[in-house]
């Protein structure tokens, strides 16, 4: 409906219009909180009795699945309707083992889906004594000091402890994608890259 209206208005007004998937770092919590105060029975993304929030833009509920390809199957049809602002965040519990694993995942997404933007978003922690630690560790495994855990809030990384209450609730409910158990049921990667003219293997991994 919105795509049709956008197209119609562009023809009528001879102007360009954009259908954008806007981020909602703070409003997803603020609006849900106000709605809950005014309409106590309204449904939000959180569980009953927990801090209310709405899912960001038109993303899937954060606890929908831990299979990245299941999520991509759903989001691909929707996100390609937007003309800007849309992105799929691949929330990973930890960093991938090496650049080849990251390249392989990007290659599969590029070959099998049409969505325009996606991120690989691992969680990491920072200890003031030992620096970078892969994954979520609220205490340093080496010295026991409290760390800062970083995750992508929407378009950028911030320490989780600095997120608003709604985003913290979202983080607690979020399922990270388990790549070891994610199944791509329609893999056309080899077919798409069959005629690749890259000069080196690493160029198209």
Regions found by a protein language model. Give the residues of each.
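Single conserved hydrophobic/aromatic residue that forms the stacking wall/gate
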Residues: 1-12
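Short cysteine-rich clusters marking metal-coordination/redox-active sites
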Residues: 127, 140-143
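Phosphate-handling catalytic cores of nucleic-acid transaction enzymes
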Residues: 134, 144-149, 158-174
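Acidic, low-complexity intrinsically disordered tails
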Residues: 176-205
């Amino acid at each position: 409906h919105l795509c049709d209206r956008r197209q119609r208005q562009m023809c009528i007004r001879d102007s360009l219009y954009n259908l954008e998937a806007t981020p909602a770092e703070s409003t997803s919590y603020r609006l849900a909180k106000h709605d809950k105060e005014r309409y106590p029975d309204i449904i939000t993304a959180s569980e009953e009795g927990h801090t209310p929030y709405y899912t960001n833009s038109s993303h899937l509920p954060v606890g929908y699945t831990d299979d990245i390809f299941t999520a991509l199957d759903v989001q691909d049809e929707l996100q390609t309707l937007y003309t800007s602002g849309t992105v799929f965040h691949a929330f990973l519990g930890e960093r991938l083992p090496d650049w080849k694993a990251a390249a392989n995942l990007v290659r599969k997404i590029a070959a099998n889906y049409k969505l325009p933007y996606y991120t690989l978003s691992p969680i990491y922690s920072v200890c003031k004594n030992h620096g970078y630690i892969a994954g979520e560790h609220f205490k340093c495994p080496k010295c026991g000091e409290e760390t800062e855990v970083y995750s992508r809030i929407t378009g950028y990384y911030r320490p989780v402890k600095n997120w608003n209450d709604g985003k913290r609730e979202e983080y607690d409910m979020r399922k990270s994608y388990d790549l070891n158990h994610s199944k791509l049921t329609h893999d056309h990667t080899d077919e798409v890259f069959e005629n690749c003219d890259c000069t080196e293997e690493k160029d198209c991994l």
